[in-house]
Structure formats: C-alpha cells, structure tokens
UniProtKB/Swiss-Prot annotation:
<feature type="region of interest" description="Disordered">
    <location>
        <begin position="281"/>
        <end position="335"/>
    </location>
</feature>
<dbReference type="GO" id="GO:0050905">
    <property type="term" value="P:neuromuscular process"/>
</dbReference>
<dbReference type="GO" id="GO:0007634">
    <property type="term" value="P:optokinetic behavior"/>
</dbReference>
<dbReference type="GO" id="GO:0000978">
    <property type="term" value="F:RNA polymerase II cis-regulatory region sequence-specific DNA binding"/>
</dbReference>
<dbReference type="GO" id="GO:0007605">
    <property type="term" value="P:sensory perception of sound"/>
</dbReference>
<keyword id="KW-0804">Transcription</keyword>
<dbReference type="GO" id="GO:0005634">
    <property type="term" value="C:nucleus"/>
</dbReference>
<keyword id="KW-0539">Nucleus</keyword>
<dbReference type="InterPro" id="IPR017970">
    <property type="entry name" value="Homeobox_CS"/>
</dbReference>
<dbReference type="GO" id="GO:0060876">
    <property type="term" value="P:semicircular canal formation"/>
</dbReference>
<dbReference type="InterPro" id="IPR001356">
    <property type="entry name" value="HD"/>
</dbReference>
<dbReference type="Pfam" id="PF00046">
    <property type="entry name" value="Homeodomain"/>
</dbReference>
<feature type="compositionally biased region" description="Low complexity">
    <location>
        <begin position="313"/>
        <end position="328"/>
    </location>
</feature>
<keyword id="KW-0217">Developmental protein</keyword>
<dbReference type="GO" id="GO:0048844">
    <property type="term" value="P:artery morphogenesis"/>
</dbReference>
<feature type="region of interest" description="Disordered">
    <location>
        <begin position="61"/>
        <end position="80"/>
    </location>
</feature>
<dbReference type="InterPro" id="IPR046327">
    <property type="entry name" value="HXA1/B1/D1"/>
</dbReference>
Length: 335
C-alpha cells in the first residue's frame, strides 16, 4: 500500500477454517456506514490473492501505518455515525463465469461492537459481521491490528476492531441517526439531559403580583345611571325634550324645588335635569358667540354658576322677607 496517498483501504487478513496460512486480504475503508457482509458460496480454503472486498468511500491519510500485534485484552467499542449506503463489491478469482462479481449495498444498521479480543487465542463469536467506519481521528500515526477472520465456507465472518492512536484511543459511541448533524445531536442531548426534565415550574415575577382594580360599572338608579364616569348617555324622548325646552325658555337656571318638580313630572331624576340645563346653557353661549342668536341680557356671561348656586341657596332657605324688601315692596305698591 502506498504511504503517500492512501485511500484508507485497510487490509484485513482472512483466516480460513481449514488452513491458517492461506489468507487473502480484504480491504475495508475507514469511512463507511455500518455494513453487514454476506459471505459468498465458495470454499474459504480456495481463496486466493484476488479474493477481496472493495468498499467505496476512502479518506486521505498522510501518515504511514505501523502494524503491531498486541497480545493483551482490551475493550473495543465501535459505533459510528455515517451517511449514505455503502457499496461493497466482492469478486473471487476461483469463481466461475456464472458467479461473476456480487455487489452489496448494505443499509444503515447501528450496532455497538463491544468485544474483548485476544489475538493469540480464539476469536469471539458474534452475529452478522459488523464493521463500522467514519473515523474522525487526527493525522497522527495509526497503530492498529489486523482484524482476524474465522469461519467456515458460508459462515458469518467475525471481526476484531482496530484500536487507533498511539495510546489505543477508544472511539465514542454514536447513538444518533445518520441524518443528524453534530449540532443537532448536541441539541438533542441537551434536551434529554435530566436538568431539562426536572425544570422548575413557571416563575412568578413581581409584576404578576400587582393587583389591579376591576373596571367600575355604573349602578342602575331609579331612572338610569347615577353619577358614574362611564354612565350611559341618557336618551330623552320628544315629550321630555319639549318640556325641558319650554322650561329653559322661561328660566335659564332652576331652583332645586323646581328641578325636583320637573324631574318628577318627566320621569327623570334630579341629576339628569341639572345636567341637561347645564348643557343647554353651554349650547346657548356657543350660538351667541357664533352670531346665530342675539345676546340675551338676562344674566351676564360668567355669572351662570353663581346665579344657579344662589338660586339653590334661596330655595333651600326659608322664605322670610327682610325688613328692607318689605318696605321696598310697600313703596312700589303705593306708587
């Protein structure tokens, strides 16, 4: 194998069941998905030098390979994360023309190969042979074993995994799907962590503890809503408006007694009559300013509230004629 340009086709000797000396090399790349190899129906004893497994994708490894056989036992977990199917072609020199070359496209099947291998002794028995790749090791010198192969003519091959690196670096187990990138894998691992499972319930902040007053609703009185800021506007009937306009034509300001009397006759409350007269006076002033109506000399502008307050006080106080007013009345009557 060329050390300058190496497609990482790692050759593994095949130990046939009958003769341990006649071995042919099977080349496997170090970057392919987990593959189950099926043995062909030829005798393992007749395997020549042309009996090879050729596997598709290779990686560029710049450092030479040093082959060492270690005679001690060590755990070798092997699972990898790969993408795409692996194309395996198998050809045998002793097979006839009718046999030809077989191509295997193995699906993705993540197995964890965790075995303890003793190179000097027997080899562990396992199910369909699984070799997994996608070795993401740096460009350092790789010390590896030749993986042994033992079995019959049609038996399932067994493999002993390499240990890469000068200190026999153990490869991490990849338990995620092949479609996930490392970023997504780390995100899923963070989501599956026990800290997220035992997350605290919703926190209560200070602004959530503030008690807000509910909106005020107007209380329904005898004739409608009373004295509330969000009181509904009173809709007066035509008869009520006619009587109020008639009273406004004679008296711009009402005494409390007269206001109670008008409210009782029109089926309104005292507050409604008072507010109607206030609005009517403001409307009158607006029209006078616009020149639509002549200025009424009854009360000077600006003294409306004083006149209304004085009328209320006079209506509430007992009607006791003063001595001056009585003398003035007698004088006017004598004249």
């Amino acid at each position: 194998m060329d050390n300058a340009r190496m497609n990482s086709f790692l050759e593994y000797p095949i130990l046939s069941s009958g003769d341990s000396g006649t071995c042919s090399a099977r080349a496997y790349p170090s970057d392919h998905r987990i593959t189950t190899f099926q043995s062909c129906a030829v005798s393992a004893n007749s395997c020549g030098g042309d009996d090879r497994f050729l596997v598709g994708r290779g990686v560029q490894i710049g450092s030479p390979h040093h082959h060492h056989h270690h005679h001690h036992r060590h755990p070798q977990p092997a699972t990898y994360q790969t993408s795409g199917n692996l194309g395996v072609s198998y050809s045998h020199s002793s097979c006839g023309p009718s046999y030809g070359s077989q191509n295997f496209s193995a699906p993705y099947s993540p197995y964890a190969l965790n075995q303890e291998a003793d190179v000097s002794g027997g080899y562990p028995q396992c199910a369909p042979a699984v070799y997994s790749g996608n070795l993401s090791s740096p460009m350092v010198q790789h010390h590896h074993h030749h993986q042994g192969y033992a079995g019959g003519a049609v038996g399932s091959p067994q493999y002993i995994h390499h240990s890469y690196g000068q200190e026999h670096q153990s490869l991490a187990l990849a338990t995620y799907n092949n479609s996930l990138s490392p970023l997504h894998a780390s995100h899923q691992e963070a989501c599956r962590s026990p800290a997220s499972e035992t997350s605290s319930p919703a926190q209560t902040f200070d602004w959530m503890k503030v008690k807000r007053n509910p909106p005020k609703t107007g209380k329904v009185g005898e004739y409608g809503y009373l004295g509330q800021p969000n009181a509904v506007r009173t809709n007066f009937t035509t008869k009520q408006l006619t009587e109020l306009e008639k009273e406004f034509h004679f008296n711009k300001y009402l005494t409390r007694a007269r206001r109670v009397e008008i409210a009782a006759s029109l089926q309104l409350n005292e507050t409604q009559v008072k507010i109607w007269f206030q609005n009517r006076r403001m409307k009158q002033k607006k029209r006078e300013k616009e020149g639509l109506l002549p200025i009424s000399p009854a009360t000077p502008p600006g003294n409306d509230e004083k006149a209304e307050e004085s009328s209320e006080k006079s209506s509430s106080s007992p009607c006791v004629p003063s001595p001056g007013s009585s003398t003035s009345d007698t004088l006017t009557t004598s004249h």
